[in-house]
């Protein structure tokens, strides 16, 4: 086990001392993008039918590209401000979010319904249930990763109160664990069982196993989701967590929430957050929403497989379905993945010169 020195091994002061991870789209570029979305929006048109070349991003795409690069290959997160919001309906803003995803990579399905874009919005689900998911609940979430190289969140409406985004570097947490509790770091390099929250595809088991930390080709990969580990304990055949495993989990969460390590932010309407899911752990506080449906908290979430991805550890193959670089990978295939989904994956991967799993 080694300490990793990298831009992604940041602490709070590192983020506060520089703004190289923060990007702004100016008003003129935002207006151009708004007009492009409005001209292309059709309530009855399937999102899969849009091509990246249809959208006019102007010079704003260079800004978004830099933000993607920062999140993917440097600090592990970035924020873009200035997406057009005021003159777009919720559905038009959804199309804008989708358009960004089309240019940035191949979107991946996110759940039981095999949905390729999700509204991060409270629909009354129970986060702690065996099939619970955080994005459809207003509960406070555990620190976790998503099942894709990158997560993009775009903010249309913020909550009445709460809903604060929390991000901690998994790389930094790894380093702290080695320094302070090397005995627990050794446990973190061993496999833990995670539940698929009853969203497994027909060819998948209800659980998968992964270490919390693993090294491949000189890169550190981080994985964590307490809620899924706890859910897995109720699934037949999953071994009971050992005392040391429980202590490792608790110590990891304690590190992640240290004030000097946990970065917090509120996403404002028109903000976009980009997170690297094998470097960063993210969470969110609980929130109180508005009664008015038009004002309710709404963020759009995309899971992306980018064309410049790197090789993953061998053990991640069950988790991502492929570990090879520049391969379409990740996502929760779910139970509604059909020919329409497969055709989108095939067509869009070809557009981006990416490879796709064929078996």
Residue ranges and their predicted role:
Residues 1-61, 65-66, 72-73, 78, ...:
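Active-site environment of non-heme Fe oxygenases that use a 2-His-1-carboxylate facial triad
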């Amino acid at each position: 086990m080694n300490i990793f020195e990298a831009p992604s091994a940041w602490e709070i002061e590192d983020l506060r001392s520089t703004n190289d991870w923060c990007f702004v789209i100016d008003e003129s570029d935002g207006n151009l993008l708004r007009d492009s979305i409005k001209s292309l929006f059709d309530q009855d048109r399937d999102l899969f039918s849009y091509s990246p070349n249809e959208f006019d991003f102007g010079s704003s795409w260079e800004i978004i590209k830099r933000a993607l690069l920062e999140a993917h290959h440097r600090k592990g997160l970035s924020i873009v401000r200035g997406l057009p919001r005021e003159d777009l309906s919720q559905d038009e803003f959804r199309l804008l979010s989708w358009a960004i995803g089309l240019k940035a990579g191949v979107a991946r399905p996110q759940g039981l319904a095999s949905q390729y874009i999700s509204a991060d919005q409270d629909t009354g689900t129970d986060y702690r249930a065996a099939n619970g998911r955080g994005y459809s609940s207003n509960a406070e979430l555990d620190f976790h990763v998503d099942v894709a190289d990158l997560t993009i969140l775009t903010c249309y409406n913020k909550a009445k109160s709460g809903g604060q985004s929390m991000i901690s570097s998994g790389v930094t947490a790894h380093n702290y664990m080695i320094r302070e509790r090397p005995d627990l770091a050794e446990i973190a390099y061993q496999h833990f069982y995670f539940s698929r929250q009853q969203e497994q595809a027909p060819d998948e088991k209800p659980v998968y196993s992964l270490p919390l930390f693993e090294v491949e080709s000189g890169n550190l990969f981080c994985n964590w989701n307490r809620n899924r580990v706890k859910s897995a304990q109720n699934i037949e055949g999953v071994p009971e967590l050992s005392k040391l495993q429980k202590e490792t989990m608790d110590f990891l969460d304690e590190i992640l929430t240290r004030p000097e390590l946990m970065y917090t932010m509120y996403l404002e309407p028109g903000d976009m957050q980009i997170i690297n899911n094998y470097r960063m752990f993210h969470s969110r506080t609980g929130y109180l929403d508005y009664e008015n449906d038009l004002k309710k908290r709404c963020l759009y979430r995309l899971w992306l497989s980018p064309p410049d991805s790197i090789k993953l550890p061998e053990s991640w193959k069950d988790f991502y379905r492929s570990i090879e670089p520049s391969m379409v990978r990740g996502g929760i295939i779910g139970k509604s993945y059909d020919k329409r989904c497969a055709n989108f994956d095939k067509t869009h991967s070809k557009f981006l010169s990416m490879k796709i799993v064929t078996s």
